[in-house]
Amino acid sequence: MVGEIVESAVLSSVLVLVGLAIGFLLLKVQGE
């Protein structure tokens, strides 16, 4: 169904955003 496709797309994009945020925070911590 279309709903499942949208749901999985939202989940994957959220996971990517979380991964980027964690990587950014780790880089900031290492920079200091």
Swiss-Prot record:
InterPro entries: PetM_cyt_b6/f_cplx_su7 (IPR012595). Keywords: Chloroplast, Electron transport, Membrane, Photosynthesis, Plastid, Thylakoid, Transmembrane, Transmembrane helix, Transport. It holds the Pfam family PetM. SUPFAM superfamilies: PetM subunit of the cytochrome b6f complex. Its main location: plastid. One of its GO terms (molecular function) is electron transfer activity. This is Cytochrome b6-f complex subunit 7.
